[in-house]
Amino acid sequence: MAATPAFRGSFTALVTPFKNGSLDEEAFRKLVNWQIAEGTTGLVPVGTTGESPTLSHDEHHKVVEWCVEEAKGRVPVIAGAGSNSTTEAVELAKHAEKAGADAVLVVTPYYNKPTQEGMYLHFKAINDAIGIPIIIYNIPPRSVVDMSVDTMSRLYELQNIVGVKDATANLGRVSQQRHAMGPDFIQLSGEDMTALAYMAAGGHGCISVVSNVAPKACSDLMAAVFKGDYAGALKIQDRLVPLHDAVFKEPGVSGAKHGLTLLGRIQEEVRLPLIPVSAPTGQAIRSAMIHAGLLN
């Protein structure tokens, strides 16, 4: 396990803005700066929310480079480097390290359903290829496989494995992983709705989709938790619950992009097979943003 930067607080799983079918570099760089100004404590480009499945390798590389350049060391950048091909994941991780990312986020291999040993060897190959921290992304609903606590514990013995983004929706895993790996194993919630409860059980932060739209509120919630002000955090959560619901009525990427479009920060474009949100979902997002104090 490597020495790690301060991977705690509110991390935004950044959307990737498009304009006329191409990457919108200007909008992306402005989004990075706005996120930091609003209090976001870390950035995660080219994950699922960044539409990594529909980016070319060249586009993937560019977005990581732009994020690192624009962040200028003000907050850590955890670059998405996941694939169900170990060779491809190694290549993406090597590029992220070369670009100056502080860490990589690597999803458990999806669709091809590896065994626990296959997952271990996949992450070990990435560990052996780079020298920056690796955060496991465990998301059984999308990957179909669930990395066991035992496999995670074995991986934590390696030099660069430092933590997990946990989207199991099983709050018991926080305590089980803390017991197995200890309090220094970084645990980041991957579920906006349950992030507050995750933190109360021993989490270190959240990699959030909703913080694309509500970065200050998400950051303030984490800050309240770190101060032990759970009553204050709950008040913020009460404002955000309708937005958590609305953004995920359809794929969260489309929901987050719709919210950012309402704020005038990006164009709503997504790439097929994703499509923009329907009119009823769009109205639900608008209403939730008004409830959260993000729109008048």
UniProtKB/Swiss-Prot annotation:
Its main location: cytoplasm. Pathway: Amino-acid biosynthesis; L-lysine biosynthesis via DAP pathway; (S)-tetrahydrodipicolinate from L-aspartate: step 3/4. Pyruvate binds at residues 49, 207. It catalyses: L-aspartate 4-semialdehyde + pyruvate = (2S,4S)-4-hydroxy-2,3,4,5-tetrahydrodipicolinate + H2O + H(+). It is found in: Cytoplasm. Belongs to the DapA family. This is 4-hydroxy-tetrahydrodipicolinate synthase.
